[in-house]
Amino acid sequence: MARATSDAGPAAIRQRQAQRGLTRLMVRDMRSLRRIIIPSRLEATVPAWITAVRALVDQYGAGSSALSADYYEAERVAARVTGSFSVPLADSPPEEQVENGLRWATKDVWPRDPDDPATTEAQRQPMDVRLEQAEKKAEAVAQKLVVDQGRDTVTGAVQRDRQATAWARSAALGACSFCKLLATRGAVYKQDTADFQAHDGCHCGVVPVFKGQRFELSDHAREWERLYREFAAPHSGDQLRRFRLALAEHGHLPGL
């Protein structure tokens, strides 16, 4: 008889919590780097700050990969599959990707002509406000880059492991509508072309599924699936918006 596994199983929840704990430590360390940026010397200090943050992304990304490898190996043992398998750790993100993300996060700190119509409201704010907003954006960018390494470690292992059949998305109760929609698809991902779609600040996890296992959506994911099918699926081109509204109306978007 096939053994059941779920997006809300104890191991999947612990893995999400471990990754969140890791990124909290990274954010703490990032905030200590803010002093590197000197408003009167942006051209010299912003690049230095980017270099320092990039080192943190490498450091914590390696930790995310290691956590995910341990998680995958434990799930493989729990599934009682045969044969040995060594989990390959995902590579660090390219330097260009990290730098582009951090440059985007800090784009509003640079001086602008307040009378220029192209200057946005965010760019007209006092420097301390602009720096605070840049820091929040940068933290979300770095968080995704770090956790992506862990998620890529699991999806990469599933693609290479002959005993793995698929992977599923594990979304928290407080996840956004986009993540909840993808989580309702269950264990349908296996191919090399099936990338894990994530946004800045995304804390979703990956659940590997092995031979002899049967994946089951959690109760809350089944409810998300019902809401999508009933309120959004028939409306082509407007499905995500309608799904978001349905989640909010039924108490599944606590952030709204």
Regions found by a protein language model. Name each.
Residues 1-53, 148-256:
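Activation/maturation switch segments at domain boundaries
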